[in-house]
Amino acid sequence: MDTLRFSGKDVIDMALRIEENGLTFYTEAGNASTSDKVRELFQFLGDEEKRHIHCFENIGHGYASDTLPGTSDPYVEESALYLGALANSRVFTEPNEGKKLAQAVRDEDDALRVAISMEKDSILFYYELQKVVRDQDKAVLGQLIDEEKKHLAKLTELQNLLSRTGE
């Protein structure tokens, strides 16, 4: 039974949506921030999201709208089901979710919590995505995962710094 019910293009579109929502969130939340440190980090992360969008657009050129091949490997089938569940999350499906999230934040600490959550969700999604993409795309996803981990570390470090200094 083929458990992967979306095309390779659909999966790449989900990844693009993640990055687009991240870009919108970092832009909106950065503009609203009163902390120079938060604003500068969000500017950097927004620039990173732009670069990631370009990477996924390049990966997407190799995928048609046909469904990715199924597999009898239960581990990959489980990944496909997980991707499908993630795909139903609003962050992955709603085009303006990044803006809505940014408008809902109350302060810098809240913005950092949302950003940390978004980065964690991205990492989880990309790990699962690595299991179903073509071999030549796995290395690119590995690099993106490493970058997302660095983003997560920077966000966590800034959150800890701000909580200690009370900024």
Label the predicted regions.
Residues 1-167:
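Non-heme di-metal
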